[in-house]
């Protein structure tokens, strides 16, 4: 009334109040009862609504490697997200998980909050599988492993470098025969392996549905809300 909220009107009754708290939740996790109705209510009061979308959400990748490594959790890796221009927009150390649809886990959920421009930009992930070693030290480690078992297959050698389910993917990307002996590995193959372990890349095509997101990004435009009290500046 006269630009002020004076209560809540239900289907049968009206509840007068000096103030009304609008706390309906976002559109993520609808199983909790959050339907996003609060956006409609706020809009009816004149508030501008920034289109809501899921945040802290798993990411979809069409890279077949994700399906091949489904269920594999990587620990102590560094994840970098690059945009179309190759600029790093996220970099963090931690854990992630390969799934049947792409990638998930703490690192990926954190990264998803920085990917807001799917309509105009493209993104790819770059995983440093050995962040504790620079390229020179990693190559020395590989040389040592190859030299200690010169007649062993690279398939077995690589199992000491990466998780077992990742070995076929590594060999496929390098174009190497799993049964190639360690003493037959060329300098070029060794350096290609170093690059792959430090920059294991894959494209991502978008986030999973908002129903799977942990939080909602967007909603009532923050400039129309008092930051100290969260009270509306409009009513």
Where are these regions (language model features)?
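A conserved short coil-to-beta-strand element within the FAD-binding core of flavoproteins
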Residues: 1-4
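Short hydrophobic core segments
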Residues: 8, 15-30, 42-43, 96-101, ...
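General beta-strand structural signal in soluble alpha/beta enzymes
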Residues: 22, 49-52, 206-207
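Glycine-rich nucleotide phosphate-binding loop and flanking beta-alpha elements
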Residues: 27-30, 105, 115, 228-229
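Glycine-rich beta-alpha-beta "Rossmann" dinucleotide-binding loop(s) and their flanking helix/strand
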Residues: 30-50
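An anion/pyrophosphate-binding glycine-rich loop and adjacent beta-alpha core
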Residues: 47-53, 58-181
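A glycine-rich dinucleotide-binding beta-alpha-beta segment and adjacent secondary-structure elements
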Residues: 168-235
């Amino acid at each position: 009334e006269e630009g002020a909220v004076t209560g809540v009107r239900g289907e049968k009754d009206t509840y007068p109040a000096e103030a009304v708290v609008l706390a309906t939740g976002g559109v993520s996790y609808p199983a909790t009862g959050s339907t996003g109705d609060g956006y409609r209510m706020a809009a009816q009061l004149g508030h501008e609504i920034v289109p809501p979308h899921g945040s802290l959400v798993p990411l979809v990748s069409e890279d077949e490697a994700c399906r091949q490594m489904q269920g594999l959790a990587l620990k102590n890796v560094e994840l970098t997200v690059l945009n179309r221009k190759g600029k790093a927009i996220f970099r963090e150390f931690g854990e992630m998980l390969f799934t049947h649809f792409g990638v998930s886990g703490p690192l990926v959920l954190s990264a998803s909050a920085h990917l807001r421009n799917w309509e105009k930009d493209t993104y790819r992930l770059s995983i440093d599988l050995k962040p504790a070693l620079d390229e020179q030290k990693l190559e020395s480690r590989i040389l040592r492993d190859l030299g200690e078992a010169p007649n062993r297959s690279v398939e077995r050698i690589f199992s000491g470098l990466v998780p077992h389910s990742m070995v076929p993917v590594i060999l496929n990307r390098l174009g190497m025969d799993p049964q190639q002996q360690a003493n037959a590995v060329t300098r070029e193959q060794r350096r290609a392996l170093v690059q792959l372990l430090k920059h294991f890349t894959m494209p991502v095509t978008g986030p999973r549905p908002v129903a799977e997101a942990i939080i909602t990004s967007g909603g009532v435009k923050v400039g129309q809300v008092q930051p100290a009290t969260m009270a509306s500046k409009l009513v």
